């Protein structure tokens, strides 16, 4: 049933947390499926568990070269304020923020300007999937501040490249956030 419904193929990366499976399918037998986990252990899963329950299959992500990034940073709420024209001009005149000079700036606060900048930064990045959802948004404030979430997809699906890309973009974001007086 797994093969007939194309639920699983050898080589698929699957996750089944309750059984400790997180790796590549090695073998699909009549009664068991063997998964080589990323820590080089083998998990043997009864096929009925996969047919009757839920598991995560990462095949679609790999086939379509699109892996989601969904992370947030917290902004100190006390630093969020309305922007006067002079402050707005001073912010966008900084060399690191050149991306803001070409667009229309219909924002009232420094956090909105920061969101506009990061959105434009992602729109101009070659490794961001432009045909998929790309969003910079504010989440519900917490005791830790105002979470600004970055939701996007990258064409880098291989684990090490994916993690390096996240390091690159979040290092950039964290280095420019103070330029917005946040």
Describe each region flagged by the PLM.
Residues 1-36, 41-44, 51:
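Membrane-bilayer interface helices and TM-boundary transition segments
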């Amino acid at each position: 049933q797994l093969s007939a419904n194309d639920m699983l193929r050898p080589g698929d990366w699957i996750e089944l947390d309750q059984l400790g499976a997180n790796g590549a399918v090695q073998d699909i037998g009549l009664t068991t499926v063997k998964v080589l986990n990323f820590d080089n252990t083998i998990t043997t899963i009864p096929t009925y568990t996969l047919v009757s329950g839920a598991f995560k299959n990462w095949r679609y992500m790999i086939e379509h070269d699109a892996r989601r990034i969904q992370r947030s940073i917290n902004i100190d709420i006390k630093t969020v304020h309305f922007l006067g024209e002079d402050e707005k001009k001073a912010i966008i005149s900084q060399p690191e923020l050149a991306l803001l000079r070409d667009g229309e700036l219909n924002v009232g606060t420094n956090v909105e300007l920061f969101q506009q900048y990061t959105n434009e930064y992602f729109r101009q990045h070659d490794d961001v999937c432009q045909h998929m959802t790309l969003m910079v948004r504010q989440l519900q404030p917490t005791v830790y501040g105002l979470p600004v979430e970055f939701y996007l997809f990258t064409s880098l699906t291989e684990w090490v490249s994916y993690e390096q890309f996240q390091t690159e973009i979040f290092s950039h974001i964290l280095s420019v956030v103070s330029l917005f007086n946040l």
